[in-house]
Regions:
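Carbohydrate-active catalytic/glycan-binding domains of CAZyme proteins
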Residues: 1-212
Length: 212
């Protein structure tokens, strides 16, 4: 995320601790690790043991009302959030925002009216479905979900393995930037709608190249 002339980024850390590395840059080329957002994962009884490939999947960092937020999907436990006013300092303990199984690739979004949302994908290994995107409304402070989890796009016909939601709004349109097609043959999509729940039109904005 961008705050003034500073850029911040984080990444999946799965079960490794400290987790959620915080990277800072002023030019989007040179990056420095300035800290970590998570010292301990919950539930402790699960992560006190080796837990390969579990834990923090595909986090999203955002800045809202003077605070930095990171949300991530733990495919076995649900959606978690940590926040801070100083990204290089100490982050608050993780909050379980939404208890569930199979949710991954979460991204928060705050609208102009103060309402908050969390978009996400699904891990087929846990949820029993994938290739769809969904949206849940949150309380304005982003600490818990309210209402139902609604599928906003089904990619089975045109964009299988769609995942990795990143949410934005510009000129009255809600935008989702996300990958689809799987790792070996994947591509990047831009989707947009006048309604956060859709329907969404989409366009491939970056595709696989060829090496001769």
């Amino acid at each position: 995320c961008r705050v003034g002339n500073d850029y911040y980024m984080t990444a999946s850390s799965f079960g490794c601790l400290p987790g959620l590395p915080i990277l800072h840059s002023v030019d989007l080329v040179n990056w420095e690790i300035i800290g970590y957002a998570v010292e301990r994962l919950e539930p402790a009884e699960q992560f006190d043991l080796a837990s390969h490939g579990n834990g923090i999947w595909a986090p999203a960092i955002r800045y809202h009302n003077g605070e930095f937020y990171i949300y991530w999907g733990d495919p076995d436990n649900g959606i978690y959030m940590v926040k801070t006013k100083d990204p290089a300092g100490r982050w608050e303990k993780p909050i379980l925002v939404h208890k569930s199984k199979g949710i991954i690739d979460t991204c928060p979004f705050w609208d102009e009216d103060g309402r908050a949302w969390i978009g996400h994908g699904f891990a087929g290994s846990r949820a029993g479905l994938k290739s769809v995107l969904a949206m849940i409304e949150m309380t304005p402070d982003g600490t818990k979900t309210i209402g139902e989890d609604r599928i906003i796009y089904d990619g089975h016909e045109d964009n299988v393995t769609i995942e990795g939601v990143k949410l934005y709004k510009r000129d009255g349109y809600y935008y989702i930037l996300c990958p689809a097609g799987g790792v070996p043959t994947g591509y990047q999509l831009a989707m947009r709608s006048k309604d956060i729940y859709g329907p969404y039109e989409w366009k491939i904005v970056m595709a696989q190249g060829k090496t001769d």
